[in-house]
Amino acid sequence: MKQICILGSTGSIGTQALDVIEQHSDRYEVYCLTANNRYEMLAEQARKFRPAAVVIANKAHYEALKLLLADLPDIKVYAGAKALDEIVEAQPIDMVLTAMVGFAGLSPTIHAIKARKTICLANKETLVVAGDLICRLAAEYHVNILPVDSEHSAIFQSIVGEGDNEIEKILLTASGGPFRKFTLDEMRDVKAADALRHPTWDMGAKITIDSASMMNKGFEVIEAKWLFGVEADKIQVLVHPQSIVHSAVQFRDGGVKAQLGVPDMRLPIQYAFSFPERLPLNGDRLDLFRQPLEFFEPDMEKFRCLAMAYEAIRRGGNVPCIMNAANEVVNEAFRHDRCGFLQMADIIEATMQRATFIAQPTYDDYIASDAEARRIAASML
């Protein structure tokens, strides 16, 4: 019985992970659930899955959560960022699913790696911000990082059994988001409500906006570089509106392996949990007769965030960290009508130019760079 800790259990990935665990309750048990603000939902989940502990990151909700679980004394209730770092180190835990959003996922992921827990990585910002550090720590502590993003899971599934066969190119697919066919003038006027209507995936608000701007795909290019040791110029983004081909790998003989399936995040979540085994999963099955599969080149002028991600990789150091911090600020501002859709890229680009460059950042440098970039980006709103 694998004991699983879910960082971010009330979000889109977290709730779908609990569905997987419920389907395979003979194999998986929830050791800990965590949330940032949604304490009522966290309490409901705790009642259903009976974990050993729950953590609410926002300390303001601690008393309310404790009250909701007062009749279940076996469930320990903790609060705060430090509690997140400590809970992932708990001895019974086998796997940690990092489904938190943003920079906040970095510290508990590092603590989980140092405690030699298998990492099911859904928090892509961890590798965007500190890919070099995370990969070095994973190697040092002999920890497996299993990708949960559908694209990276597809790449991972495509290279299983390939041993040392060299990857010639990664074909990273993108839906193109809701504004794929918009002109720049049309994109100038879009609002958060428009961007939150993703054509193929059901995701949280932050990642849905990132998908609309294609910053999410930029993050995934960086994530793929670190996960698979492939340089950015060998990672090609393909706009694939149907989201059926989740990604593909081209090898040096010209052969291409791809992973296909209906857009259902439970599949990559379950694959990370069960690897190398495949377990049954209820849900729709792929019908290739239903629709044609299309592929287009992304428009880097319209979707500047994707171009900036390649630039951040090229510059290296703390630049991806700076880009991520600025993006978190403008993404939230856009969702609250304090920033225009195209203005997000302007502010991110300006922050990348103005923030202090550090060629070989330490963990403390990442913390400082994140704070500095947030201040710079916020000053332009």
Would you name each region that the model predicts?
Residues 1-381:
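Catalytic, metal-anchored helix/loop core of enzyme active sites in primary metabolism
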